[in-house]
Design a protein with these regions (language model features):
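Short, charged beta->alpha transition segments
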Residues: 52-60, 110-113, 140-144
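Canonical Radical SAM [4Fe-4S] cluster-binding loop centered on the CxxxCxxC motif
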Residues: 4-50
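Conserved C-terminal portion of the radical SAM core fold
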Residues: 139-258
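N-terminal, charged/glycine-rich beta-strand/loop interface patches
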Residues: 56-60, 83, 90
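Distinct, well-ordered alpha-helical segments
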Residues: 81-88, 109-117, 136-140, 168-171, ...
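Radical SAM enzyme core and accessory elements
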Residues: 1-3, 263
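Non-catalytic positions within long, well-ordered alpha-helices that form the structural scaffold/packing
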Residues: 60-62, 117, 176
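Core AdoMet radical
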Residues: 38-50, 63-79, 93-108, 119-140, ...
């Protein structure tokens, strides 16, 4: 970690009083590294939306005392009214809860940002898709800039490709100037499918393929070579440049360990 770290990241490591809810696995993006199609019930959840408000209410009735909740997908903002209702209900059921939203920015505008803030949203995490071209990147950066000053903590969360170190350094500097609170750098993972896209990009596994000896509720994958080194280089860069933005590295091992605790 370099600088600020989201309290949600700290809670995620042990899964204490923290839960993430999936409204839908449907998404307008087609990221080659996406884990979601590897979910056991992907076909059944792709359309959505799931009744995440009812799930929250069930957890409250069971005696849960949640301090961190998140809404993810897919793209939760394909269903904006339901997303707002989720955060409103989370605040009612668990006063003071830290809430966060994961989004590509699809369907987001100033009016929806204001509604989300009014519903109690604490943190929003945007993904920047480096392979979608300059125009798409500028569009999401504009949304990120609009979110700064509306949502208390604005973040970017994205996997790091080993050959995009230069781009990522420029992005960190730009996000820092925009007033973005933090960046969560993810170790790129192979999602156990879509292998032809990884071959086309000359991406290789970090180690020899191995059988995952755990029944993960969230089907993750195997780490890709070079991504961790690039993430660590970006951490050093942020410190050496004195950037104010918080930079956090989340390895595939960290994701797996956190899930073991949660399950």
């Amino acid at each position: 970690v370099s600088g600020w770290q989201s309290p949600a990241c700290e809670a995620c490591r042990l899964g204490l009083h923290a839960e993430t809810y999936v409204m839908t696995l449907a998404c307008p993006r087609r990221c080659f590294f996406c884990f979601n199609p590897n979910q056991a019930d992907f076909d059944g959840r792709a359309a959505g939306p799931r009744d995440v408000v009812r799930q929250l209410e069930a957890r409250a009735r069971s005696g849960a005392h949640l301090r961190h909740v998140a809404l993810t997908g897919g793209e939760p903002l394909l269903h904006p009214d339901e997303a707002v209702a989720f955060f409103e209900r989370a605040w009612e059921l668990f006063p003071g809860v830290h809430s966060r939203l994961y989004t590509s920015g699809a369907g987001l505008d100033g009016a929806l940002l204001t509604r989300l803030r009014g519903a109690g949203l604490s943190e929003i995490r945007f993904s920047v898709k480096t392979d979608e071209g300059a125009v798409a990147i500028e569009e999401v950066l504009a949304l990120i800039g609009e979110a700064v000053g509306v949502i208390p903590d604005v973040m970017v969360e994205m996997p790091v490709m080993s050959d995009e170190l230069g781009f990522m350094k420029e992005l960190l500097v730009r996000l820092d100037r925009m007033g973005v609170r933090g960046v969560n750098l993810l170790e790129l993972g192979f999602p156990l499918f879509n292998g032809e896209e990884f071959v086309r990009r000359d991406l290789k596994l970090k180690g020899e393929p191995y059988r995952v000896l755990y029944d993960y509720a969230y089907a993750a994958g195997l780490p890709v070579a070079g991504s961790e080194e690039a993430c660590l280089a970006l951490l050093r860069f942020a410190r050496e440049e004195g950037l104010s933005i918080g930079v956090h590295y989340c390895s595939m091992e960290n994701k797996h360990t956190g899930q073991v605790y949660r399950q």
